[in-house]
Protein backbone atom coordinates (compact mmCIF):
# COMPACT_ATOMS: atom_id res chain seq x y z
CA UNK A 1 0.00 0.00 0.00
CA UNK A 2 1.46 3.36 -1.03
CA UNK A 3 0.44 6.88 -0.05
CA UNK A 4 -1.00 8.95 -2.92
CA UNK A 5 0.88 12.12 -3.84
CA UNK A 6 1.72 14.26 -6.87
CA UNK A 7 4.72 12.69 -8.58
CA UNK A 8 7.40 14.31 -10.70
CA UNK A 9 6.86 13.81 -14.45
CA UNK A 10 8.82 10.81 -15.70
CA UNK A 11 11.28 12.85 -17.76
CA UNK A 12 12.24 14.85 -14.66
CA UNK A 13 12.59 11.74 -12.49
CA UNK A 14 14.83 10.16 -15.13
CA UNK A 15 17.02 13.26 -15.32
CA UNK A 16 17.37 13.54 -11.54
CA UNK A 17 18.49 9.91 -11.34
CA UNK A 18 20.92 10.25 -14.24
CA UNK A 19 22.54 13.26 -12.58
CA UNK A 20 22.87 11.43 -9.26
CA UNK A 21 20.48 13.59 -7.26
CA UNK A 22 18.17 10.66 -6.64
CA UNK A 23 20.10 7.58 -5.50
CA UNK A 24 17.17 5.30 -4.62
CA UNK A 25 18.28 4.86 -1.01
CA UNK A 26 15.88 4.89 1.95
CA UNK A 27 16.25 7.82 4.33
CA UNK A 28 17.01 5.27 7.07
CA UNK A 29 20.44 4.89 5.43
CA UNK A 30 21.41 8.12 7.21
CA UNK A 31 21.37 6.16 10.47
CA UNK A 32 22.04 2.55 9.48
CA UNK A 33 25.33 3.42 7.76
CA UNK A 34 26.63 4.22 11.28
CA UNK A 35 24.83 1.36 13.07
CA UNK A 36 28.09 -0.18 14.32
CA UNK A 37 29.55 3.12 15.54
CA UNK A 38 30.01 3.92 19.22
CA UNK A 39 30.44 7.63 18.47
CA UNK A 40 27.91 9.83 20.25
CA UNK A 41 24.92 10.70 18.06
CA UNK A 42 22.63 12.57 20.49
CA UNK A 43 23.04 14.35 23.80
CA UNK A 44 19.80 15.16 25.62
CA UNK A 45 20.45 16.63 29.05
CA UNK A 46 22.46 14.06 30.99
CA UNK A 47 21.56 11.29 28.52
CA UNK A 48 23.61 10.41 25.49
CA UNK A 49 23.10 7.83 22.76
CA UNK A 50 25.73 6.39 20.46
CA UNK A 51 24.84 5.65 16.86
CA UNK A 52 24.70 1.96 17.75
CA UNK A 53 22.29 2.70 20.61
CA UNK A 54 20.14 5.07 18.54
CA UNK A 55 19.79 2.49 15.79
CA UNK A 56 18.99 -0.30 18.27
CA UNK A 57 16.38 1.85 20.03
CA UNK A 58 14.74 2.57 16.67
CA UNK A 59 14.71 -1.16 15.86
CA UNK A 60 13.19 -1.95 19.25
CA UNK A 61 10.38 0.56 18.83
CA UNK A 62 9.72 -0.50 15.25
CA UNK A 63 9.50 -4.14 16.31
CA UNK A 64 7.12 -3.27 19.15
CA UNK A 65 4.86 -1.25 16.85
CA UNK A 66 4.84 -4.07 14.31
CA UNK A 67 3.73 -6.49 17.05
CA UNK A 68 0.89 -4.07 17.80
CA UNK A 69 -0.28 -4.27 14.21
CA UNK A 70 1.22 -1.16 12.59
CA UNK A 71 1.85 -1.93 8.90
CA UNK A 72 3.84 -0.48 5.98
CA UNK A 73 1.99 2.20 4.05
CA UNK A 74 0.19 3.54 7.11
CA UNK A 75 0.64 6.96 8.68
CA UNK A 76 1.41 8.27 12.17
CA UNK A 77 0.89 11.52 14.02
CA UNK A 78 3.85 12.35 16.26
CA UNK A 79 4.15 15.23 18.73
CA UNK A 80 7.39 15.22 20.67
CA UNK A 81 9.61 18.12 21.69
CA UNK A 82 13.39 18.47 21.61
CA UNK A 83 14.07 15.05 23.07
CA UNK A 84 16.06 12.04 21.87
CA UNK A 85 12.84 10.06 21.53
CA UNK A 86 11.90 12.24 18.56
CA UNK A 87 14.76 10.78 16.52
CA UNK A 88 14.19 7.25 17.82
CA UNK A 89 10.54 7.49 16.79
CA UNK A 90 11.31 9.08 13.43
CA UNK A 91 13.74 6.36 12.37
CA UNK A 92 11.57 3.58 13.81
CA UNK A 93 8.61 4.67 11.70
CA UNK A 94 10.74 4.97 8.58
CA UNK A 95 12.11 1.47 9.18
CA UNK A 96 8.49 0.24 9.28
CA UNK A 97 7.51 2.04 6.09
CA UNK A 98 5.15 4.30 8.06
CA UNK A 99 4.96 7.98 7.07
CA UNK A 100 4.71 10.35 10.04
CA UNK A 101 3.59 13.92 10.46
CA UNK A 102 5.89 15.56 13.00
CA UNK A 103 3.69 18.11 14.74
CA UNK A 104 5.51 20.85 16.61
CA UNK A 105 5.35 20.70 20.39
CA UNK A 106 3.68 24.12 20.43
CA UNK A 107 0.77 22.87 18.33
CA UNK A 108 -2.60 22.54 20.02
CA UNK A 109 -5.88 20.78 19.35
CA UNK A 110 -6.72 22.70 16.18
CA UNK A 111 -3.50 21.72 14.40
CA UNK A 112 -3.53 18.13 15.64
CA UNK A 113 -7.12 17.64 14.53
CA UNK A 114 -6.34 19.12 11.13
CA UNK A 115 -3.35 16.82 10.60
CA UNK A 116 -5.20 13.72 11.79
CA UNK A 117 -8.17 14.49 9.54
CA UNK A 118 -5.86 14.63 6.53
CA UNK A 119 -3.64 11.59 7.07
CA UNK A 120 -6.01 9.33 9.08
CA UNK A 121 -3.18 7.97 11.23
CA UNK A 122 -3.04 4.43 12.56
CA UNK A 123 -0.68 5.54 15.32
CA UNK A 124 -0.45 8.47 17.74
CA UNK A 125 2.78 9.19 19.62
CA UNK A 126 2.77 12.10 22.07
CA UNK A 127 4.12 13.27 25.43
CA UNK A 128 2.34 13.36 28.78
CA UNK A 129 4.25 16.57 29.51
CA UNK A 130 2.24 18.37 26.83
CA UNK A 131 -0.80 20.07 28.36
CA UNK A 132 -3.17 18.29 25.96
CA UNK A 133 -2.00 14.84 27.03
CA UNK A 134 -1.33 15.44 30.72
CA UNK A 135 -4.67 13.77 31.43
CA UNK A 136 -6.92 11.47 29.41
CA UNK A 137 -9.77 13.80 28.46
CA UNK A 138 -8.30 15.15 25.24
CA UNK A 139 -6.65 11.83 24.40
CA UNK A 140 -9.91 9.90 24.67
CA UNK A 141 -11.82 12.51 22.67
CA UNK A 142 -9.12 12.67 20.01
CA UNK A 143 -8.98 8.90 19.54
CA UNK A 144 -12.77 8.72 19.42
CA UNK A 145 -12.97 11.46 16.78
CA UNK A 146 -10.19 9.92 14.68
CA UNK A 147 -11.22 6.29 14.55
CA UNK A 148 -8.26 5.33 12.33
CA UNK A 149 -5.99 5.47 15.41
CA UNK A 150 -5.42 1.91 16.66
CA UNK A 151 -2.23 2.36 18.69
CA UNK A 152 -1.22 5.08 21.17
CA UNK A 153 2.25 5.48 22.68
CA UNK A 154 3.04 8.24 25.19
CA UNK A 155 6.36 9.50 26.48
CA UNK A 156 6.44 10.01 30.27
CA UNK A 157 3.51 7.62 30.70
CA UNK A 158 3.41 5.09 33.51
CA UNK A 159 0.54 3.04 32.13
CA UNK A 160 -0.34 0.92 29.12
CA UNK A 161 0.79 3.51 26.56
CA UNK A 162 4.39 3.77 27.83
CA UNK A 163 6.63 4.71 24.90
CA UNK A 164 9.81 4.08 26.85
CA UNK A 165 8.79 0.47 27.51
CA UNK A 166 8.34 -0.05 23.77
CA UNK A 167 11.77 1.47 23.10
CA UNK A 168 13.43 -0.71 25.74
CA UNK A 169 11.79 -3.99 24.64
CA UNK A 170 14.41 -5.93 22.63
CA UNK A 171 13.76 -6.30 18.93
CA UNK A 172 13.20 -9.95 18.05
CA UNK A 173 14.63 -10.73 14.62
CA UNK A 174 13.51 -7.37 13.26
CA UNK A 175 13.94 -6.67 9.55
CA UNK A 176 13.27 -3.16 8.30
CA UNK A 177 10.70 -2.60 5.55
CA UNK A 178 11.11 1.04 4.51
CA UNK A 179 8.89 2.33 1.74
CA UNK A 180 10.41 2.51 -1.78
CA UNK A 181 12.73 5.47 -2.31
CA UNK A 182 10.37 7.21 -4.74
CA UNK A 183 7.43 7.01 -2.31
CA UNK A 184 6.41 9.29 0.57
CA UNK A 185 8.79 9.01 3.53
CA UNK A 186 7.08 11.59 5.73
CA UNK A 187 5.03 14.77 5.72
CA UNK A 188 6.42 18.21 6.40
CA UNK A 189 4.31 21.16 7.55
CA UNK A 190 3.56 24.17 5.41
CA UNK A 191 4.71 27.47 6.88
CA UNK A 192 1.45 29.16 5.86
CA UNK A 193 -0.50 30.99 8.55
CA UNK A 194 -3.99 30.99 7.04
CA UNK A 195 -6.60 28.30 6.44
CA UNK A 196 -6.30 24.61 7.25
CA UNK A 197 -2.67 23.57 7.84
CA UNK A 198 -1.32 21.96 4.68
CA UNK A 199 0.89 18.89 4.51
CA UNK A 200 3.89 18.45 2.23
CA UNK A 201 4.67 14.90 1.11
CA UNK A 202 8.43 14.33 0.89
CA UNK A 203 10.01 11.25 -0.68
CA UNK A 204 13.16 9.40 0.36
CA UNK A 205 14.87 10.45 -2.86
CA UNK A 206 14.15 14.15 -2.74
CA UNK A 207 14.66 14.61 1.00
CA UNK A 208 17.86 12.56 1.15
CA UNK A 209 19.30 14.67 -1.66
CA UNK A 210 18.40 17.86 0.21
CA UNK A 211 20.18 16.63 3.34
CA UNK A 212 23.19 15.26 1.46
CA UNK A 213 23.74 18.42 -0.58
CA UNK A 214 23.30 20.60 2.52
CA UNK A 215 26.03 18.62 4.30
CA UNK A 216 28.37 19.22 1.36
CA UNK A 217 27.71 22.96 1.25
CA UNK A 218 27.91 23.47 5.02
CA UNK A 219 30.91 21.12 5.37
CA UNK A 220 29.53 19.02 8.22
CA UNK A 221 31.87 16.23 9.36
CA UNK A 222 32.31 13.73 12.21
CA UNK A 223 33.69 16.67 14.20
CA UNK A 224 30.43 18.65 13.86
CA UNK A 225 28.80 19.33 17.22
CA UNK A 226 25.40 20.87 16.48
CA UNK A 227 23.18 22.56 19.03
CA UNK A 228 19.51 22.06 18.14
CA UNK A 229 17.71 24.80 20.06
CA UNK A 230 14.93 25.59 17.58
CA UNK A 231 12.01 23.11 17.31
CA UNK A 232 13.68 19.83 16.35
CA UNK A 233 10.71 18.64 14.28
CA UNK A 234 10.84 21.69 12.02
CA UNK A 235 12.20 21.23 8.50
CA UNK A 236 14.98 23.78 9.11
CA UNK A 237 16.21 21.87 12.16
CA UNK A 238 15.83 18.48 10.47
CA UNK A 239 17.44 18.96 7.09
CA UNK A 240 19.25 22.26 6.49
CA UNK A 241 21.53 20.40 7.21
CA UNK A 242 20.01 20.04 10.66
CA UNK A 243 20.06 16.91 12.75
CA UNK A 244 19.74 14.58 9.78
CA UNK A 245 22.76 16.26 8.21
CA UNK A 246 24.73 15.78 11.41
CA UNK A 247 23.75 12.10 11.54
CA UNK A 248 24.73 11.62 7.90
CA UNK A 249 28.16 13.11 8.64
CA UNK A 250 28.57 11.09 11.84
CA UNK A 251 28.64 14.14 14.15
CA UNK A 252 26.82 14.89 17.40
CA UNK A 253 23.47 16.62 18.02
CA UNK A 254 23.01 18.36 21.37
CA UNK A 255 19.39 19.16 22.20
CA UNK A 256 18.17 22.28 23.99
CA UNK A 257 14.59 22.96 25.07
CA UNK A 258 14.64 26.53 23.75
CA UNK A 259 17.05 29.04 22.15
CA UNK A 260 17.42 31.34 25.17
CA UNK A 261 20.91 32.62 25.86
CA UNK A 262 20.71 31.52 29.49
CA UNK A 263 20.21 27.90 28.39
CA UNK A 264 22.28 27.81 25.20
CA UNK A 265 25.44 29.69 26.18
CA UNK A 266 26.40 27.19 28.93
CA UNK A 267 25.54 24.25 26.64
CA UNK A 268 27.78 25.66 23.91
CA UNK A 269 30.65 25.91 26.37
CA UNK A 270 30.02 22.53 28.04
CA UNK A 271 29.73 20.53 24.83
CA UNK A 272 32.09 22.61 22.68
CA UNK A 273 29.37 23.29 20.12
CA UNK A 274 30.78 24.46 16.79
CA UNK A 275 27.57 25.06 14.80
CA UNK A 276 23.98 25.97 15.55
CA UNK A 277 20.92 27.37 13.80
CA UNK A 278 18.61 30.17 14.93
CA UNK A 279 15.75 32.34 13.72
CA UNK A 280 16.24 36.14 13.73
CA UNK A 281 14.35 36.87 16.98
CA UNK A 282 16.64 34.45 18.82
CA UNK A 283 19.69 36.15 17.29
CA UNK A 284 18.45 39.44 18.73
CA UNK A 285 18.10 37.81 22.15
CA UNK A 286 21.64 36.45 22.01
CA UNK A 287 23.05 39.83 20.99
CA UNK A 288 21.06 41.52 23.74
CA UNK A 289 22.40 39.04 26.30
CA UNK A 290 25.96 39.81 25.24
CA UNK A 291 25.25 43.53 25.47
CA UNK A 292 23.91 43.03 28.99
CA UNK A 293 27.00 41.22 30.20
CA UNK A 294 26.84 37.54 29.23
CA UNK A 295 30.36 36.30 28.61
CA UNK A 296 31.35 35.90 24.97
CA UNK A 297 33.99 33.43 26.18
CA UNK A 298 31.21 30.83 26.53
CA UNK A 299 30.83 30.95 22.73
CA UNK A 300 34.51 30.47 21.91
CA UNK A 301 33.97 27.06 20.28
CA UNK A 302 31.17 28.31 17.99
CA UNK A 303 32.41 28.56 14.41
CA UNK A 304 29.20 28.82 12.37
CA UNK A 305 25.81 30.35 13.10
CA UNK A 306 23.09 29.60 10.58
CA UNK A 307 20.16 32.00 10.50
CA UNK A 308 16.94 31.23 8.64
CA UNK A 309 13.22 30.80 9.04
CA UNK A 310 12.62 34.50 8.40
CA UNK A 311 14.46 37.36 6.73
CA UNK A 312 17.54 38.50 8.65
CA UNK A 313 18.11 42.25 8.49
CA UNK A 314 21.51 43.44 7.30
CA UNK A 315 21.86 45.34 10.57
CA UNK A 316 21.58 42.16 12.64
CA UNK A 317 23.63 40.16 10.14
CA UNK A 318 26.59 42.52 10.44
CA UNK A 319 26.56 42.24 14.23
CA UNK A 320 26.94 38.44 14.31
CA UNK A 321 30.63 38.13 13.35
CA UNK A 322 31.48 41.32 15.24
CA UNK A 323 29.72 40.51 18.51
CA UNK A 324 29.24 36.73 18.62
CA UNK A 325 32.58 36.11 16.96
CA UNK A 326 31.63 33.38 14.48
CA UNK A 327 30.79 33.08 10.80
CA UNK A 328 27.24 33.76 9.67
CA UNK A 329 25.49 31.60 7.09
CA UNK A 330 22.13 32.77 5.82
CA UNK A 331 19.60 30.03 5.04
CA UNK A 332 16.51 30.70 2.95
CA UNK A 333 14.50 27.56 2.50
CA UNK A 334 11.03 26.14 2.66
CA UNK A 335 9.52 22.86 3.78
CA UNK A 336 8.17 22.54 0.24
CA UNK A 337 11.72 22.07 -1.05
CA UNK A 338 13.99 24.83 -2.35
CA UNK A 339 16.92 25.70 -0.07
CA UNK A 340 19.37 28.56 -0.58
CA UNK A 341 22.57 29.14 1.37
CA UNK A 342 25.22 31.78 1.45
CA UNK A 343 28.42 29.82 0.95
CA UNK A 344 31.17 29.63 3.55
CA UNK A 345 33.62 31.34 1.19
CA UNK A 346 31.25 34.12 0.10
CA UNK A 347 32.20 37.74 0.59
CA UNK A 348 30.93 39.59 3.66
CA UNK A 349 28.79 41.69 1.32
CA UNK A 350 26.94 38.61 0.01
CA UNK A 351 26.59 37.01 3.44
CA UNK A 352 25.17 40.14 5.07
CA UNK A 353 22.96 41.43 2.27
CA UNK A 354 21.62 38.31 0.50
CA UNK A 355 20.02 35.00 1.39
CA UNK A 356 22.38 32.99 -0.79
CA UNK A 357 21.66 30.95 -3.89
CA UNK A 358 20.11 27.53 -4.58
CA UNK A 359 21.81 24.27 -3.61
CA UNK A 360 21.41 22.40 -6.86
CA UNK A 361 22.34 23.21 -10.47
CA UNK A 362 18.91 21.87 -11.46
CA UNK A 363 17.03 24.19 -9.12
CA UNK A 364 15.05 26.32 -11.55
CA UNK A 365 14.24 29.69 -9.98
CA UNK A 366 12.78 32.80 -11.59
CA UNK A 367 10.79 35.88 -10.66
CA UNK A 368 7.23 36.47 -11.84
CA UNK A 369 4.87 39.42 -11.79
CA UNK A 370 1.32 39.19 -10.44
CA UNK A 371 0.12 37.67 -13.74
CA UNK A 372 2.83 35.00 -13.78
CA UNK A 373 5.03 36.65 -16.42
CA UNK A 374 8.84 36.65 -16.05
CA UNK A 375 10.38 39.86 -14.72
CA UNK A 376 13.77 41.27 -15.73
CA UNK A 377 16.78 40.49 -13.57
CA UNK A 378 16.92 42.54 -10.39
CA UNK A 379 13.23 43.36 -10.23
CA UNK A 380 11.12 42.30 -7.26
CA UNK A 381 8.41 39.71 -7.80
CA UNK A 382 7.08 36.29 -6.89
CA UNK A 383 9.52 33.42 -6.43
CA UNK A 384 8.80 30.55 -8.84
CA UNK A 385 10.70 27.28 -8.53
CA UNK A 386 10.90 23.59 -9.37
CA UNK A 387 13.69 21.05 -8.96
CA UNK A 388 14.80 17.63 -7.73
CA UNK A 389 13.79 18.23 -4.11
CA UNK A 390 10.88 20.67 -4.51
CA UNK A 391 7.52 18.96 -4.14
CA UNK A 392 4.83 18.88 -6.84
CA UNK A 393 1.70 19.26 -4.71
CA UNK A 394 0.25 19.53 -1.22
CA UNK A 395 -1.35 16.39 0.19
CA UNK A 396 -5.05 16.02 -0.67
CA UNK A 397 -5.31 19.70 -1.57
CA UNK A 398 -6.21 19.98 -5.28
CA UNK A 399 -7.85 23.38 -4.94
CA UNK A 400 -4.81 24.95 -3.30
CA UNK A 401 -2.45 23.19 -5.71
CA UNK A 402 -4.29 24.78 -8.62
CA UNK A 403 -3.27 28.23 -7.39
CA UNK A 404 0.14 27.30 -5.95
CA UNK A 405 1.58 25.84 -9.18
CA UNK A 406 1.69 27.10 -12.74
CA UNK A 407 1.01 24.97 -15.80
CA UNK A 408 4.68 23.93 -16.00
CA UNK A 409 4.92 22.66 -12.43
CA UNK A 410 6.64 25.71 -10.96
CA UNK A 411 5.73 26.33 -7.34
CA UNK A 412 4.81 29.86 -6.25
CA UNK A 413 5.88 30.20 -2.62
CA UNK A 414 4.41 33.64 -1.97
CA UNK A 415 7.86 35.07 -1.28
CA UNK A 416 8.82 38.34 -2.94
CA UNK A 417 12.44 38.20 -4.08
CA UNK A 418 14.98 39.71 -6.42
CA UNK A 419 17.90 37.88 -8.05
CA UNK A 420 21.22 39.58 -8.77
CA UNK A 421 23.46 38.88 -11.81
CA UNK A 422 25.36 36.19 -9.87
CA UNK A 423 22.17 34.34 -8.95
CA UNK A 424 22.02 35.43 -5.32
CA UNK A 425 18.54 35.86 -3.91
CA UNK A 426 17.42 38.73 -1.71
CA UNK A 427 14.11 38.21 0.05
CA UNK A 428 12.05 41.39 -0.04
CA UNK A 429 9.07 40.08 1.93
CA UNK A 430 5.88 38.16 1.37
CA UNK A 431 2.95 39.01 -0.84
CA UNK A 432 0.69 39.00 2.21
CA UNK A 433 3.11 41.35 3.99
CA UNK A 434 2.49 44.00 1.38
CA UNK A 435 0.41 46.92 2.63
CA UNK A 436 -1.74 48.71 0.05
CA UNK A 437 -2.04 52.28 1.34
CA UNK A 438 -4.38 54.07 -1.01
CA UNK A 439 -2.86 52.29 -4.01
CA UNK A 440 0.74 52.76 -2.86
CA UNK A 441 2.40 49.42 -2.03
CA UNK A 442 4.56 49.13 1.08
CA UNK A 443 6.79 46.06 1.61
CA UNK A 444 6.69 45.52 5.37
CA UNK A 445 10.18 44.06 5.58
CA UNK A 446 11.71 47.15 3.96
CA UNK A 447 10.35 49.35 6.76
CA UNK A 448 11.17 46.77 9.45
CA UNK A 449 14.79 46.65 8.33
CA UNK A 450 15.01 50.45 8.47
CA UNK A 451 13.45 50.52 11.93
CA UNK A 452 16.02 48.00 13.16
CA UNK A 453 18.74 50.53 12.36
CA UNK A 454 17.46 52.74 15.17
CA UNK A 455 19.71 52.22 18.21
CA UNK A 456 16.71 51.94 20.56
CA UNK A 457 14.84 49.30 18.52
CA UNK A 458 15.30 45.60 19.36
CA UNK A 459 12.47 44.10 17.27
CA UNK A 460 10.14 45.60 14.68
CA UNK A 461 7.05 44.39 12.85
CA UNK A 462 4.92 46.37 10.42
CA UNK A 463 1.34 45.26 9.82
CA UNK A 464 -1.69 46.61 8.02
CA UNK A 465 -4.74 48.06 9.71
CA UNK A 466 -8.05 48.78 8.05
CA UNK A 467 -8.86 52.38 7.13
CA UNK A 468 -12.07 53.66 5.58
CA UNK A 469 -10.34 56.28 3.44
CA UNK A 470 -7.08 54.63 2.42
CA UNK A 471 -8.20 51.01 2.53
CA UNK A 472 -5.16 50.13 4.62
CA UNK A 473 -2.73 52.02 6.81
CA UNK A 474 0.34 50.74 8.59
CA UNK A 475 1.16 50.15 12.23
CA UNK A 476 4.68 49.56 13.52
CA UNK A 477 5.01 47.35 16.59
CA UNK A 478 8.33 47.93 18.33
CA UNK A 479 10.21 46.32 21.19
CA UNK A 480 12.55 49.03 22.43
CA UNK A 481 15.41 49.57 24.88
CA UNK A 482 14.11 53.03 25.82
CA UNK A 483 10.84 54.90 25.25
CA UNK A 484 10.21 56.06 21.67
CA UNK A 485 7.45 58.37 20.48
CA UNK A 486 5.82 58.06 17.08
CA UNK A 487 7.17 61.44 16.01
CA UNK A 488 10.72 60.27 16.74
CA UNK A 489 10.20 57.09 14.75
CA UNK A 490 8.87 58.97 11.73
CA UNK A 491 11.68 61.52 11.91
CA UNK A 492 14.22 58.70 11.94
CA UNK A 493 12.61 57.01 8.93
CA UNK A 494 12.52 60.29 7.02
CA UNK A 495 16.25 60.54 7.64
CA UNK A 496 16.62 57.16 5.90
CA UNK A 497 15.25 58.78 2.74
CA UNK A 498 12.00 56.87 2.25
CA UNK A 499 8.76 58.12 0.75
CA UNK A 500 6.22 59.73 3.07
CA UNK A 501 3.57 57.13 2.35
CA UNK A 502 5.86 54.47 3.82
CA UNK A 503 5.96 56.12 7.25
CA UNK A 504 3.95 54.16 9.85
CA UNK A 505 0.58 55.72 10.53
CA UNK A 506 0.68 54.30 14.03
CA UNK A 507 3.46 53.20 16.38
CA UNK A 508 2.97 50.80 19.29
CA UNK A 509 5.78 50.01 21.73
CA UNK A 510 5.28 46.60 23.37
CA UNK A 511 7.22 44.36 25.73
CA UNK A 512 7.45 41.51 23.22
CA UNK A 513 6.16 40.36 19.85
CA UNK A 514 4.02 37.22 19.56
CA UNK A 515 5.71 34.37 17.69
CA UNK A 516 4.37 31.48 15.62
CA UNK A 517 5.28 27.88 16.43
CA UNK A 518 8.39 28.10 14.25
CA UNK A 519 9.66 31.35 15.73
CA UNK A 520 8.42 33.86 13.19
CA UNK A 521 6.64 37.04 14.23
CA UNK A 522 2.92 36.25 14.36
CA UNK A 523 1.52 39.12 12.31
CA UNK A 524 -1.93 37.61 12.35
CA UNK A 525 -1.95 38.05 16.13
CA UNK A 526 -0.73 41.64 15.80
CA UNK A 527 -3.56 42.44 13.40
CA UNK A 528 -6.00 40.91 15.86
CA UNK A 529 -4.64 43.19 18.58
CA UNK A 530 -5.32 46.17 16.35
CA UNK A 531 -8.80 44.97 15.47
CA UNK A 532 -9.70 44.38 19.12
CA UNK A 533 -8.54 47.87 20.07
CA UNK A 534 -10.51 49.42 17.22
CA UNK A 535 -13.70 47.67 18.32
CA UNK A 536 -13.22 48.41 22.02
Swiss-Prot record:
Substrate binds at residues 235, 240, 309, 331, 335, 415, 432, 441. GO terms for molecular function: 2,3-dihydroxybenzoate--[aryl-carrier protein] ligase; 2,3-dihydroxybenzoate-serine ligase activity; acyltransferase activity; ATP binding. It catalyses: 3 2,3-dihydroxybenzoate + 3 L-serine + 6 ATP = enterobactin + 6 AMP + 6 diphosphate + 4 H(+); 2,3-dihydroxybenzoate + holo-[ACP] + ATP = 2,3-dihydroxybenzoyl-[ACP] + AMP + diphosphate; 2,3-dihydroxybenzoyl-5'-AMP + holo-[ACP] = 2,3-dihydroxybenzoyl-[ACP] + AMP + H(+). It is found in: Membrane. Pathway: Siderophore biosynthesis; enterobactin biosynthesis. Pfam families: AMP-binding, AMP-binding_C. This is Enterobactin synthase component E.
Amino acid sequence: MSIPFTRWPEEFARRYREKGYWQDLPLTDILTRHAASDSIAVIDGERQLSYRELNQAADNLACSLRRQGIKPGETALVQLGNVAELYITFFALLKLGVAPVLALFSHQRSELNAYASQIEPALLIADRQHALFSGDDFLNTFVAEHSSIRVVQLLNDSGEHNLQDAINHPADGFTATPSPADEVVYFQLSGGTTGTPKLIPRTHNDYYYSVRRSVEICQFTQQTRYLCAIPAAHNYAMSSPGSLGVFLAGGTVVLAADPSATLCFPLIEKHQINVTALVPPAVSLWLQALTEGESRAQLASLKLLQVGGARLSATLAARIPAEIGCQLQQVFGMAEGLVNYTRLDDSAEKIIHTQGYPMCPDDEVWVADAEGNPLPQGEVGRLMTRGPYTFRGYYKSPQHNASAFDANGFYCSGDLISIDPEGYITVQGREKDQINRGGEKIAAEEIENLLLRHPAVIYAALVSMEDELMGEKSCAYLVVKEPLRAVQVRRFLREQGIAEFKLPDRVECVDSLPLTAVGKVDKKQLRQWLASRASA
